[in-house]
A protein has these predicted regions:
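Anion-binding and metal-coordination hotspots
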Residues: 1-284
């Protein structure tokens, strides 16, 4: 009995693979995900695929279908697909906050791409002045000429250890600093949540990357690229889902699903091309 169960579990793990922790019984390539359209309203997980498209001049330039639930993990495969198709990487890959991660920023640096993907806290960093300038955030702690980081109360923070970040491809490490003495601190209630000396995590490289992203996206060019992305990328999905009523994949298996999405994308591009040619003819 145990041997039979063990074989069953081994087979399930083999189907699931290393990159995910679930699969559908009716389609082994599909992964259970939370989708935006929750008809039952009970936060139910449903078998799905993560469809990614790259849009340029209103045309779908590249398509990819993934089993990853997170958009962050889909960015690099999509860029590699773009390179395979066109022989170069896009100079300005603009994306929303779901794509900004250390792995993706390093990938951009290695392949000559500028960092124009928002990170998770981008909106809060750029719109919430109180949060951005909070003196009790570790990134705002001043560093003296002696290289020692100090809190608003003037206490020193010393490096305790470094820790590798789980699931990181490029050896990202976080530094853990601890305050020398928090006892009797007048800012204790504002600064920390425990009775122990405060410990903060710092990744200066990632913080610098976030600052670079903010500068890029807050520039005039960045604002135009962001606006263009929201119109073209979101607009493309809107047209396909709402105007064409393509809201559900009908094929099973990742290869068949990719073929289906390719066909839908070709149809979208032909429709766009026809409309543009029609406008040119009308204007002439």
């Amino acid at each position: 009995e145990y041997a039979v169960k063990l074989e069953e579990y081994v087979e399930k793990i083999k189907i699931c693979g290393k990159e995910r922790n679930s699969y559908s019984k009716t389609d082994h390539s599909a992964t259970f995900m939370r989708i935006k359209t929750d008809y039952m309203g009970n936060d139910q997980l449903l078998p799905a695929y993560n469809v990614q498209v790259g849009v340029a001049d209103e045309y779908i330039a590249v398509v990819d279908v993934n089993q990853y639930r997170s958009d962050m993990d889909c960015f690099i495969p999509l860029m590699n697909e773009f390179y395979t198709t066109y022989g170069f990487y896009p100079k300005y890959p603009v994306a929303d906050a779901g794509y900004g991660s250390y792995n993706n920023y390093i990938f951009c640096e290695q392949h000559g791409m500028e960092k124009y993907m928002k990170f998770t806290m981008f909106k809060k960093e750029t719109t919430d002045r109180k949060y951005r300038e909070d003196p009790f955030r570790a990134v705002n702690f001043p560093i003296g000429e002696d290289g020692i980081m100090r809190c608003p109360n003037g206490k020193n923070f010393y490096l305790r250890y470094r820790k590798n970040v789980k699931g990181n491809k490029y050896g990202r490490q976080e530094e853990y600093y601890q305050c020398e003495d928090c006892s009797g601190c007048p800012y204790a209630e504002q600064c920390k949540k425990t009775d122990k000396n405060r410990i903060v995590r710092i990744n200066r490289e990632l913080t610098a990357m976030h600052q670079e992203v903010i500068e890029n996206l807050e520039s005039i060019q960045g604002a135009l690229l962001r606006m263009n992305r929201s119109i073209q990328a979101e607009g493309t999905f809107g047209i396909i889902k709402n105007d064409r009523w393509y809201k559900r994949i009908v094929r099973r298996g990742i290869k068949s699903v990719l073929l289906e999405v390719f066909l839908v994308s070709i149809g979208h591009n032909l429709y766009k091309y026809h409309n543009k040619q029609k406008k040119v003819a009308t204007a002439a």
